[in-house]
Amino acid sequence: MEVAMVSAESSGCNSHMPYGYAAQARARERERLAHSRAAAAAAVAAATAAVEGSGGSGGGSHHHHQSRGACTSHDPQGGRGSRRRRRQRPEKKKAHHRQSSFPHCSDLMPSGSEEKILRELSEEEEEEEDEEEEEEEGRFYYSEDDHGDECSYTDLLPQDDGGGGGYSSVRYSDCCERVVINVSGLRFETQMKTLAQFPETLLGDPEKRTQYFDPLRNEYFFDRNRPSFDAILYYYQSGGRLKRPVNVPFDIFTEEVKFYQLGEEALLKFREDEGFVREEEDRALPENEFKKQIWLLFEYPESSSPARGIAIVSVLVILISIVIFCLETLPEFRDDRDLIMALSAGGHSGLLNDTSAPHLENSGHTIFNDPFFIVETVCIVWFSFEFVVRCFACPSQALFFKNIMNIIDIVSILPYFITLGTDLAQQQGGGNGQQQQAMSFAILRIIRLVRVFRIFKLSRHSKGLQILGHTLRASMRELGLLIFFLFIGVILFSSAVYFAEADEPTTHFQSIPDAFWWAVVTMTTVGYGDMKPITVGGKIVGSLCAIAGVLTIALPVPVIVSNFNYFYHRETENEEQTQLTQNAVSCPYLPSNLLKKFRSSTSSSLGDKSEYLEMEEGVKESLCAKEGKCQGKGDDSETDKNNCSNAKAVETDV
């Protein structure tokens, strides 16, 4: 492995290797080439001397040998199109072979073809020696094409055809090079082409992973969670399938996925496979600066102090509206309000008694001077103002009206205007009959009931309600299964208890639909007791119904609880991360760009030695580290001394 990597680096193929290690490899390669040239020159000189000593055409032979010597010394830099890497041969061995071979060639062949014969004999000897060296080195050698653009590895594998031995040559491209990854002492080995499938990730990008390379051990070292890396490596091997090991917690594996930079798409798909919904993307802010400030003021209470004040006012108005909605249903307030509404409708036949009607008519009470109506009007004015302002400043009208919270705002406002329009129409049109008045009262009661949805407006300012909403959205499939199982159980046990109680004259189950209520109450383990079986068969059916209800409800509950825990812990971690980011460094004299870089770091460590050095340099260059500030003057305030102490403490930690 090391031989292949060194050879490839000498030709400029292994761009993923660190610069220092590559420079050492190139130096060793240049030294090897220098020894090869010296050995070749010595061998040619010895062969030339032997030929001249034996007689013959010495001048022409000397001229040819000199030419070949020059060519041989220049060949490693650009002579052949395909060169084979071999080890350094002893100089005496080469000299011996050439002295024993060249004299015979000069005796047998004419001087004009002597150079050709010498070259053939020399190449045959070199090929034989190369084959022996390849067998000793594991039958592995390196080759490069004419232009140096493509690096490849050739492996001689034994043939399995039963023909008595032999080897077959197999060529591998540069990406098939094997790479060793050490994760906290556990070594993994894979091919470079496997990691290159995802070039944007930490392991797939040569520049990103270079900082973790250990040149002494020729491997990449990561001080990370070991069980998680099995799934990380499988992500590359499988082409993008990310599966969490059962022995790794969800939050730890999520941190590992973020560290290896597998991407947001892979992380979102992994969370979906785990049963969680996609996180909502942050909505873009308006481009206009004025609209942006208004949007932050009404939409994000944590953005500023005025925004928190507006949020508090909104919560108080919502609570007042809900309290008024509940108080107006009390008997002492409900009777007077119904009478006022009847008078506003233009008559009081059938609705007003003889004592209350003259009193209300003489006092001039109408729906418009009712205290509950006045308070309700004030609340609606605030809700309408808030809704219109947010609609004006929103970055996208389409997304604004698709938001469930904005739909709740519209539903909570509309009943007031419908009620107001109905009252005005009745006052102008006068009484149109008792039947029409009764219908108007029924419609108004339904519309007033819709106001109860205002309580969901609190979820805009409550993290707990938001977590509950996310949990229900993530558990829609489980809730659907629960309702489906309950529906099947209600049908089965309602039919069974009806036929079990059919012969009992005093039974409560007169029909199967009458038994639906009993089945629902029994399966949910509520048990009001208003309907109960009397016969033995009915009691047996009731027992089975209760057991089936417990099992049906218990099955999807763990999934719902798991979703709630996930969203709750995620919200808690976000709050802790925000606090740690805001309180990263307490010394006010540190450079702002240094603090910004430190706070923007998503990892628990700065990760690189250069960043540590930059941190240390920034602390030293800060005002706190100056001797004149920390030591010079005696009239420094206590705050300055504390800041200087903090700066020195930070410098020591770095």
UniProtKB/Swiss-Prot annotation:
The chain crosses the membrane at residues 306-327, 372-393, 405-425, 441-461, 477-498, 540-568. A motif (PDZ-binding) lies at residues 652-654. Residues 630-641 have a biased composition (Basic and acidic residues). GO terms for biological process: action potential; potassium ion transmembrane transport; protein homooligomerization. Residues 122-137 have a biased composition (Acidic residues). Residues 81-99 have a biased composition (Basic residues). Residues 39-52 have a biased composition (Low complexity). Residues 328-371, 426-440, 499-512, 533-539 are extracellular. Keywords: Cell membrane, Cell projection, Glycoprotein, Ion channel, Ion transport, Membrane, Phosphoprotein, Potassium, Potassium channel, Potassium transport, Transmembrane, Transmembrane helix, Transport, Voltage-gated channel. It catalyses: K(+)(in) = K(+)(out). Its main location: membrane. Coiled coil: none annotated. Residues 463-476 are annotated as: S4-S5 linker. It is a multi-pass membrane protein. A motif (Selectivity filter) lies at residues 525-530. Belongs to the potassium channel family. A (Shaker) (TC 1.A.1.2) subfamily. Kv1.4/KCNA4 sub-subfamily. Voltage-gated potassium channel that mediates transmembrane potassium transport in excitable membranes. Forms tetrameric potassium-selective channels through which potassium ions pass in accordance with their electrochemical gradient. The channel alternates between opened and closed conformations in response to the voltage difference across the membrane. Homotetramer and heterotetramer of potassium channel proteins. Interacts with KCNAB1 and KCNAB2. Interacts with DLG1, DLG2 and DLG4 via their PDZ domains. Interacts with SIGMAR1. Detected in a complex with KCNA1. Interacts with KCNA2. Part of a complex containing KCNA1, KCNAB1 and LGI1. Interacts (via cytoplasmic N-terminal domain) with KCNRG. The N-terminus may be important in determining the rate of inactivation of the channel while the tail may play a role in modulation of channel activity and/or targeting of the channel to specific subcellular compartments. This is Potassium voltage-gated channel subfamily A member 4. It comes from Mustela putorius furo (European domestic ferret). The gene is KCNA4.
